[in-house]
Amino acid sequence: MTSQAVRDPLKDELLTPQNAALIIIDFQPVQVNSIASMDRQMLVNNIVGVAKLGVAFGLPIVFSSVNVKTGLNKPPIAQLRKVLGNITTYDRTTINAWEDTEFNEAVKATKRKKLIIAALWTEACLTYPALDALREGYEVYPVVDAVGGTSVEAHQAALRRIEQAGAKPIGWVQLACELQRDWIRKETVPAFMDIFIETGGTMGLQLSYDKDSHA
C-alpha cells in the first residue's frame, strides 16, 4: 500500500491543480431556465460542485457572463456567486466568449494549456470557445454533466462536434477524483469529502454517514 512518487504535476497527462484552469460561462437565470437536456436542479447542483472543486484545489478560474451590462440579461445565479465570491466576472456581448478580448486575455494569462470548461448552452457558448481553444493548441475538457442545451439532441450533437475536434469529455465526479488522485494528499481530502457530501447525490449521502460514524 505504497503510493508512487507524485508525478510532475505540470507535465502530467492527467488533470492536476497545477496544469489546469477552470472556465465557467453564462450560468445565468435565462440560460439555466431554458435547459431541456437534463434536470435543471441537478445541473445547478453539478456546476456548484465543479466551482467548489476549482476553489478547493486552487485552480485559476475564469468566470464569464453575457449581456449583463447591456441590461439584456441577469447576473450569474446566486449559487455560483456564493461559491466564487468576489472573483472577476468578464461580461460580454459575444456569444463566443473566445472572441471577447478581456475573456481571451484572462484565459491566456492563466498560462494553463488544459482548460476545464462548463458553459450554457452546450450548442453555443460551450461549443464555440471550445473549438477556438482547440484550434489554438489547448486541451479542452467539457464537463458533460454540468452543461446543458435547449434539447437533448442539441446538447448531444454539440458534444459530438467538439469531441470530434479533439475535446476530452469529463464528468464532474471524474474531475474531482482526478484532481485529488490519492488519499495520501491529505491537505485537500477534507474539502474533497465535503464537496461530495454537499453535492454528490447518493454517494454523498454514504460519505456523510461514514463521516458521522467516525466523528
Residue ranges with predicted function:
Residues T2-T93, A109, E139, A154-E163, ...:
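Active-site acidic carboxylates
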Residues G71, W98, A124:
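Short alpha-helical
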Residues P76, E102, Y128-D132:
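A short acidic, amphipathic alpha-helical/loop segment
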Residues K82, E105, L131, R135:
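Short, well-ordered alpha-helices that flank and scaffold nucleotide-derived cofactor binding pockets
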Residues R92-E105:
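Short phosphate-binding loop-to-helix
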Residues I95-A97, A109, A133:
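Long, charged low-complexity segments
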Residues V107-K113:
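Glycine-rich phosphate-binding loop signature in dinucleotide/nucleotide-binding domains
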Residues K114-G166, I170:
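A contiguous pocket-lining binding segment that forms or flanks enzyme active sites
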